[in-house]
């Protein structure tokens, strides 16, 4: 539905949409919680299997919907122990921890298809899986108020309302060098984020269309190699990144 434009008054924030989203084939929602909520509403699973090492944002939507969830164990290398095999009407959530479990989640996705939900919030530059649901988060990588990308969804209602309940106060204060104040505002904003299924805000959509993604990806890899070189003697997890 096209939004009516007002005439007169003052000028809006000027942001040119210079390019396009990195995730053109995904559906852009507000955050990872909204993506997961959409999947749960669509599939209506009887049971969802989730790892013990997980953010509460994963299981809170299940509690709100009255969906039973069961934890499974992982070892110190972030590998599942006795991974449950989802039966008909059940879902298995896999966390691609820090983007390090790519081969594993790919293999499980091929085995169980749409019964697998992959939390890819630590791997922004992956564009989904051919068989399974997955989602990633823009807010974990960039200074935007909202934004997450859902893959594997079909027949999605494109008339879902856009998110307008956003704040960029913390982003602006950090830009101005007011880190401590910005962090307090960030925590307040985080607490305000819900699980309602809404499309990404127009502000985040435009901001994310202006980013030089290739340069950003290269710089993130350089940063990783620098930190890894300093800390590798303490790290018990084998890390291989190009």
List each language-model region with its residue ranges:
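A basic- and aromatic-enriched beta-loop-alpha substructure that forms the phosphate/nucleotide-
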Residues: 91, 98-107, 117, 121-126, ...
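Structural motif
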Residues: 49, 91-94, 117, 135, ...
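Active-site PLP attachment segment
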Residues: 131-172
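Short hydrophobic/aromatic-enriched beta-strand-loop microsegments
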Residues: 68-73, 118, 134-136
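A short, well-structured juxtamembrane/interface segment
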Residues: 32-35, 223
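A short, gly/pro- and small-residue-rich
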Residues: 108-117, 148-155
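PLP-dependent aminotransferase class I/II
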Residues: 6-16, 20-27, 54, 93, ...
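PLP-dependent aminotransferase-like
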Residues: 5, 9-22, 34-112, 124
């Amino acid at each position: 539905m096209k939004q009516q434009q007002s005439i007169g008054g003052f000028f809006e924030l000027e942001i040119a949409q210079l390019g396009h989203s990195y995730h053109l084939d995904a559906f852009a929602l507000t955050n990872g919680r909204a993506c997961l909520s959409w999947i749960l509403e669509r599939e209506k699973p009887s049971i969802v299997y989730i790892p013990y090492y997980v953010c509460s944002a994963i299981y809170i939507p299940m509690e709100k919907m009255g969906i039973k969830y069961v934890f499974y164990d992982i070892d110190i290398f972030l590998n599942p122990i006795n991974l449950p095999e989802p039966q008909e009407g059940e879902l298995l959530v896999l966390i691609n921890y820090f983007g390090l479990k790519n081969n594993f989640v790919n293999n499980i996705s091929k085995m169980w298809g749409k019964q697998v939900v992959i939390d890819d919030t630590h791997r922004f530059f992956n564009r989904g899986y051919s068989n399974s649901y997955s989602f990633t988060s823009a807010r974990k990588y960039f200074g935007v108020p909202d934004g997450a990308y859902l893959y594997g969804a079909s027949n999605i209602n494109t008339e879902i309302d856009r998110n307008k309940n956003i704040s960029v106060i913390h982003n602006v204060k950090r830009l101005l060098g007011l880190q401590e104040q910005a962090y307090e505002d960030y925590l307040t904003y985080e607490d305000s984020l819900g699980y309602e299924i809404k499309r990404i805000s127009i502000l985040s959509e435009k901001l994310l269309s202006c980013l030089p993604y290739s340069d950003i990806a290269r710089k993130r890899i350089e940063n990783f190699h620098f930190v890894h070189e300093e800390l590798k003697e303490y790290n018990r997890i084998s890390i291989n990144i190009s």
